[in-house]
């Protein structure tokens, strides 16, 4: 078998007159009565091959047996196409290959999905036949971008003198965060490893070990409820450094991301990225990961609401809640009563009891609650919301968390429906100064907003014992177009501070020692100040490639129910395997 001389998508007019050896898949076959045309595809693109009896009867006879997705080896001569046959939509559209020889390297059954960017297959079928789905050019291009992103990051971190170090996959189960995936030990009866949710503790121990600058393209595992942008196993760019301030870490990440955007996407983004405190993000956007590509910020009307004539507003403020609104500029005529009812049902998903609304017309406010506002109140309301004729005003009155969640989600929905979002923009944003802890009423305890190893502001350390809810974290999230790309922080590196953190989280001394004794002891041997960040590679590629589903950026992903339709994992195992592990199943019957 002769060696391939050209990739299909790389045959250009410069090769006219040359004999080429091509190998690839049949994208399409057209029989034009005496002539057969085949579009031959490989990962670089498509080239048209012509089978002509005047060139080779033998090749034509073979071509008559060929069908879509057959794998071929074609030998032929490159010629220019006639003027009327030029296809400028293809990189190879000015030439074609006149086949002199062809051999079938492998035949193919009729595929269950169309091998094209615009396939009509359902996602389940695509996942079951993932090896066919991956043949689609859009999928290859996504993974080429993933490779380019990873390569650029590695090269950048190498120039910054970071070492790539692998940390364990079999590790210790810890109680914080999502559920662990557990792996039973055959050697240690009744004991289990856990797959890492992140390399957090190990990268900190590498700082204790004096490595100073570490990174890893790390596989992580979390047994959690899945969404469109979550997977049970995922990849993060994990970075940690000693002796750097928060500003130095953020500056380095900005330089890295601007290089990624330029090298992998061909887009120039400016640095430094804007910074916004967590409290401001929640107040203005109702989200800790705001999409800043469009306006429509939330406006706090609580002071106005406390003295207005609408009881729903006043009672919300009196009970410690708040009233906020968004002004959908020029949207009054675009939303009927039925449309607004749909928006009301939408905010109820986020805990809101309802959605109040007003339309601004030339002669004043119109809508079901307009009667509750006199002329003076209406004027104040319009001035506060900068409302003019044609605007749609939408209000939620409730607990602060409900107001933020519901209006934040409504803002994003309206941004899409009203086409306010410039999809060509890439808006990076740092969200800083997070709360250190969050209180869970159901569990009646505090949880770490990021993780238990986040350093509080120095002046807030004592608050861990007196007012934990007021303690601020030296933490930062990187947001891109409303998606959290990753999060990081400066880390606790002193034993006494870490013990105070564990105590605030409800750990007894014994529990802290049992779970994290190795870390606490490490902090007694000269641990340097350190910090870092972890960036979600899958999500970054999803955004840069213009995909809407994280599964499109992972070669062999799981479904929303954490199963693999291709291999049918998870699956039962043999009784002998369980006996070897001294395990017995106690499967609950479905009711």
Swiss-Prot record:
GO terms for molecular function: aspartate-tRNA ligase activity; aspartate-tRNA(Asn) ligase activity; ATP binding; catalytic activity, acting on a protein; nucleic acid binding; transferase activity. It is found in: Cytoplasm. SUPFAM superfamilies: Class II aaRS and biotin synthetases, GAD domain-like, Nucleic acid-binding proteins. InterPro entries: Aa-tRNA-synt_II, aa-tRNA-synth_II, aa-tRNA-synth_II/BPL/LPL, Asp-tRNA-ligase_1, Asp-tRNA-ligase_1_N, Asp/Asn-tRNA-synth_IIb, AspRS_core, GAD-like_sf. It holds the Pfam family GAD. ATP binds at residues 222-224, 231, 484, 536-539. Its EC number is 6.1.1.23. Residues 200-203 are annotated as: Aspartate. The record marks 84 as: Important for tRNA non-discrimination. Aspartyl-tRNA synthetase with relaxed tRNA specificity since it is able to aspartylate not only its cognate tRNA(Asp) but also tRNA(Asn). Reaction proceeds in two steps: L-aspartate is first activated by ATP to form Asp-AMP and then transferred to the acceptor end of tRNA(Asp/Asn). Belongs to the class-II aminoacyl-tRNA synthetase family. Type 1 subfamily. PANTHER family: ASPARTATE--TRNA LIGASE, MITOCHONDRIAL, ASPARTYL/LYSYL-TRNA SYNTHETASE. This is Aspartate--tRNA(Asp/Asn) ligase. It comes from Bacillus anthracis. The lineage of its organism: Bacteria, Bacillati, Bacillota, Bacilli, Bacillales.
